[in-house]
Each structure stands twice: as structure tokens, then as C-alpha cells.
Amino acid sequence: MGFVKVVKNKAYFKRYQVRFRRRREGKTDYYARKRLVIQDKNKYNTPKYRMIVRVTNRDIICQIAYARIEGDMIVCAAYAHELPKYGVKVGLTNYAAAYCTGLLLARRLLNRFGMDKIYEGQVEVNGGEYNVESIDGQPGAFTCYLDAGLARTTTGNKVFGALKGAVDGGLSIPHSTKRFPGYDSESKEFNAEVHRKHIMGQNVADYMRYLMEEDEDAYKKQFSQYIKNNVTPDMMEEMYKKAHAAIRENPVYEKKPKREVKKKRWNRPKMSLAQKKDRVAQKKASFLRAQERAAES
């Protein structure tokens, strides 16, 4: 069949149906969302949980959510901008920070449901394959599915760093090692040590050392915040180890104190009857004084 030009006549415009708003804005992949949201019909009121990961220019957002007609309900959330509290003050959007954010989300969620002592996850980080399995006689492992949004799911993407952090934190998320750093597509083999290096920020540390030797100015420009916070390449692994331990120790979100806002009034308030009478009396007195002065002169 040859090329057929779309005739945009009256019938075309009369029958035209716009796409969903979030599709028009390029924010939601509804093909993927349909498959992530629709639950098995024999599970009735059981929600299907998603682990949502979004990477922005300055932050990494991780959420556990489920869909309702009114909109998505957020069960738990963790953000990379919370990491300075746990000792990671720089590089809040790299792979290591994504892992920490995923770990924080998992520990926070399990703590909220009282399952943090039952499902400890992978305490010793080795970068290898790990899957959470339900324990007999205990509540089942919390299962959810990765929602990567419109991110390109290539090998080594930060989205999978957050996934690995959540799995090591004790959540059951179906996954394979094919998208983790260290997987070789040609030999079909996964090198866990390479993955561990990324989790511990050693790829960043190696680049820091390289720039130090090759181009001092580029190093100062690229890693200005690291220099400001006295973070050296040799300190990186220890910094992330301490952060992982601190997250496991206290993952609870601390609410910020509510800021008291003093209301300002820009227009004049209405005068009461007593104030109006007093104002009239003052004007009368002022007028009489002016009359007296005029008579005297």
C-alpha cells in the first residue's frame, strides 16, 4: 500500500480525540503504566505497589505508590537531598547516591510496617545478585515493581542503582543483573566487583584521581563542592559505608518544625462605631480651633 495523505476535513476535526493530558505533556508512558497498575482480577482489593524512581538535575526521588481512580497514593518516599543528614554531602545525583536513596526508602517503609527486624536485606554490600524471599510464619516480603518512567533503561542507569539499594534494603522487586554496571553483553557475564565499585563511589574517586594528575583546573571546577567539604578520593568508600550504616540505624523521616507565619494586613481595617465618633469629634474640635484663630487675627 502506498503513502496515503491524511485529509484534514470537517469529519477529521469533528471526530478528533485528544490524547491524555500527561501524554500530551510527554510525562507518562501509558503503555507501560497500564501494565504496572492493573492488578490480577483474583486479588480483589490488594493494591499493586510500584517503586517510582525519578532523577532530576539536583535530586533523586524514590517513592512507593499504588493507583486509585482519584490518583496515585504515595505510601512512602525518600529523597537524595536527605542524604547530608547521613553523612553524604556531595554527589547527590550519582549512582552511589541513587543506591543510598533506594536503601533509605526500603528501610523507611519496612520500619513503618514493623518489618525492619524481619527483613534485614543485604547488610554487607558486595554488588552481587540478591533476592528477598518470604520467611515462613512471618508476614510476606513487601513486593513492588520498578517504575522507571520515561528514563532510558540502559545498562548502568542510576534508576537501577536505586533498585539495587531497595532490594538490599529488604524489598522484593523482580529484576536481573543485566542492567547493573559490570554486566558484559558480549560475554553475558556479570562482574559484581565493578558493581560494588559504583555503589561505593569508586568510579567517581578514580576520575577524581585522573583529573588531579591530568588537569588541576578541570578538577577544581568539576569537584568544587568536594574540595569545599574536604572529600578526597580515599575517603569515598568509608563515607558511603558509614552512610549505609546510619540509614539502617535510623531511617525515620523527621518532620520539619512548622514555620509560624505572621499575617500581614495590607488594607486598612474597618473602623468601629466608637472610633468613627471619636474621629468626628476630633475633626469638629480642629475646625473650631481654626475658626477661633481666624477670629483672633
Curated annotation (Swiss-Prot):
There is a cross-link at K220 (Glycyl lysine isopeptide (Lys-Gly) (interchain with G-Cter in SUMO1)). The modification N6-acetyllysine is found at K5, K48, K220. GO terms for molecular function: 5S rRNA binding; structural constituent of ribosome. It is found in: Cytoplasm; Nucleus, Nucleolus. Residues 258-268 have a biased composition (Basic residues). InterPro entries: Rbsml_uL18_euk, Ribosomal_uL18_C_euk. The modification Phosphoserine is found at S185, S272. Residues 253-297 are annotated as: Disordered. Keywords: Acetylation, Cytoplasm, Isopeptide bond, Nucleus, Phosphoprotein, Ribonucleoprotein, Ribosomal protein, RNA-binding, rRNA-binding, Ubl conjugation. Its main location: cytoplasm. The modification Phosphothreonine is found at T232. GO terms for biological process: cytoplasmic translation; translation at postsynapse; translation at presynapse. One of its GO terms (cellular component) is presynapse. The modification N-acetylglycine is found at G2. There is a cross-link at K220 (Glycyl lysine isopeptide (Lys-Gly) (interchain with G-Cter in SUMO2)). PANTHER family: LARGE RIBOSOMAL SUBUNIT PROTEIN UL18, RIBOSOMAL PROTEIN L5-RELATED. Component of the large ribosomal subunit (LSU). Part of the 5S RNP complex, which is a LSU subcomplex composed of the 5S RNA, RPL5 and RPL11. Component of a hexameric 5S RNP precursor complex, composed of 5S RNA, RRS1, RPF2/BXDC1, RPL5, RPL11 and HEATR3; this complex acts as a precursor for ribosome assembly. Interacts with NVL in an ATP-dependent manner. Interacts with RRP1B. Interacts with IPO5, IPO7 and KPNB1; these interactions may be involved in RPL5 nuclear import for the assembly of ribosomal subunits. Component of the ribosome, a large ribonucleoprotein complex responsible for the synthesis of proteins in the cell. The small ribosomal subunit (SSU) binds messenger RNAs (mRNAs) and translates the encoded message by selecting cognate aminoacyl-transfer RNA (tRNA) molecules. The large subunit (LSU) contains the ribosomal catalytic site termed the peptidyl transferase center (PTC), which catalyzes the formation of peptide bonds, thereby polymerizing the amino acids delivered by tRNAs into a polypeptide chain. Belongs to the universal ribosomal protein uL18 family. This is Large ribosomal subunit protein uL18.
